[in-house]
Regions:
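A short, flexible helix-boundary coil/loop motif
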Residues: 1-29, 40, 157, 164, ...
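Conserved, well-structured functional cores that handle cations and Mg-NTP chemistry
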Residues: 2-204, 208-228, 232-235, 242, ...
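Generic structural signal for hydrophobic core residues of well-folded globular domains
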Residues: 40-44, 56, 72-75, 330, ...
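Short amphipathic alpha-helical "interface-anchor" segments enriched in bulky aromatics
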Residues: 105-109, 209, 256-257, 261-265, ...
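A short, structural micro-pattern
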Residues: 132-134, 220, 305-307, 319-320, ...
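Catalytic-loop motifs flanking and including active-site residues across diverse enzymes
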Residues: 136, 348, 352, 375-381
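Conserved, well-structured core segments
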Residues: 139, 328, 341, 381-383
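Charge-patterned, long linear interaction tracts outside catalytic cores
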Residues: 296-334, 347
Length: 423
């Protein structure tokens, strides 16, 4: 990259940060906001406060450390206002490649040691693929096939935390934050997105959220369609049976229902088709799929006969059984390929999480409080938004941040806390 191009990028970064400054209130927050965002987009293995202070202010690292620490951990600015401004500035860059096609609900986890970081608990940690001590944040992202951006970010507070007044007080959890399940947090985010009129009329969920029939019903009540991953044991009415009433205890007459796995195994060979799809600019992928119109056997449907929806099944060649199942309320006349394309669009959120963690340090926050956790997440999303808006200047290989801004020197005297050489 030439000097002229680098200067242009620095100018656009400055204008971008000025947009964020316009919604944070006090003028004295402008410099730490700029420096925090700069630290996040600069190359570096660790994006916690201390190393970012050393990178952004080599001559006054200690003072910069205190400034950034106060800004992210105690600053009284609004996460909602900043995320709203990020959305306003970045959405045109995303829509340049096409309209917003969907909202994606998911969560991301952060392994932690100890028990004092807000919301930390022994729970399923997606990053590690097992039960572990971690924090979990629920997110809603807007997406098309070319780009995506998280627009809502909320820490899941386990029930043990929500009911522990001492830990709540120490982590400064707001009084109005009560225990909610992750699907309940997700539905709150979807209702918020619907109320403010975010573009997009389809919600994508993996099985961790899609299995929740209350969440699916809530999406339908908003007039939105969904493509929701579900579990193999999910019950549907047998195609040959007319759906009946839901018993008071929410149980179905077993002979009249079947699991989606058993239904998939009963399908004839002609029901399966090999179909290709793409994830971004990657090579074409292919697998075997079948789709069936079904009535879901759920106790959370509206009164009366449940509506039909699509059951989409993936059964790759060589596998002993189907590997993925989705329910979808997309129109009955949608093409097979378009239904698969919608289900597979969730790959964008995996890319988001990977880049948010690897490029801008989403998981690097070392504070313990509620405000700092969310402020750091907001700043990471803001930095990521800038990288999205600059995607046309980024070469096809190499880290985004390294391609955008030059490496700043870390002072020779800098030693991370805990280092044997630290004074």
């Amino acid at each position: 990259m030439g000097l002229h191009e680098a200067k242009d990028i620095e100018s656009r970064f400055t204008r971008y940060v000025e947009g964020l400054v316009s919604v944070i209130g006090h003028a004295d927050r402008a410099v730490p906001l700029h420096d925090y965002c700069l630290g996040l987009v600069m190359p570096g293995e660790r994006k916690s406060v201390e190393p970012m202070a050393a990178i952004t202010a080599p001559g006054r690292t200690a003072a910069q450390h205190q400034s950034l620490l106060h800004f992210v951990g105690q600053g009284g600015w609004s996460d909602d206002d900043v995320l709203g401004k990020v959305r306003e500035m970045v959405l045109p860059a995303i829509e340049r490649y096409g309209p917003i096609e969907a909202w994606i609900i998911d969560d991301t986890s952060f392994p932690k040691q100890g028990r004092h970081s807000v919301g930390v608990s022994h729970q399923y940690c997606g990053q590690l693929g097992k039960q572990a001590n971690c924090q979990v944040a629920v997110t809603l992202s807007i997406t098309n096939h070319d780009a995506s951006l998280p627009v809502a970010y909320r820490l899941y507070l386990p029930k043990a935390w929500a009911e522990d007044d001492a830990r709540r007080c120490k982590a400064k959890v707001p009084e109005d934050i009560a225990f909610k399940t992750k699907p309940e947090i997700a539905l709150d985010q979807i209702r918020w997105a619907h109320e403010i009129g975010l573009p997009g009329r389809m919600v994508l969920l993996d099985a961790g959220y899609g299995h929740d029939s209350k969440l699916r019903a809530g999406i339908t009540e908003l007039g939105l369609a969904y493509v929701a991953g579900i579990l193999p044991q999910t019950l549907v009415w047998k195609p040959s049976v007319r759906p009946g009433r839901t018993p008071k205890k929410g149980r179905r007459d077993a002979p009249n229902t079947t699991s989606v796995k058993d239904l998939a195994l009963s399908l004839r060979a002609r029901a399966w088709r090999t179909i290709e799809w793409r994830e971004g600019t990657n090579e074409w992928l292919s697998s075997r799929f079948a789709r069936v119109r079904v009535h879901v056997a759920s106790s959370h449907e509206r009164p009366g006969k449940p509506s039909k929806e699509w059951l989409l099944i993936e059964w790759p060649e060589g596998e002993d059984a189907p590997t993925k199942y989705w329910l979808s309320t997309l129109p009955s006349n949608i093409t097979f390929r378009d239904l698969i394309d919608a289900a597979k669009l969730r790959w964008r959120i995996e890319r988001d999480y990977e880049e948010l963690k690897q490029e801008v340090g989403l998981g690097h926050y070392e504070g313990r409080g509620w405000r700092g956790f969310h402020h750091h997440g907001t700043m990471c999303i803001a930095a990521y938004g800038f990288l999205i808006s600059e995607r046309e200047t980024i070469p096809p290989s190499g880290p985004r941040s390294a391609a955008l801004l030059p490496q700043l020197a870390v002072p020779d005297s800098y030693r991370p806390r805990g280092s044997p050489l630290a004074a």
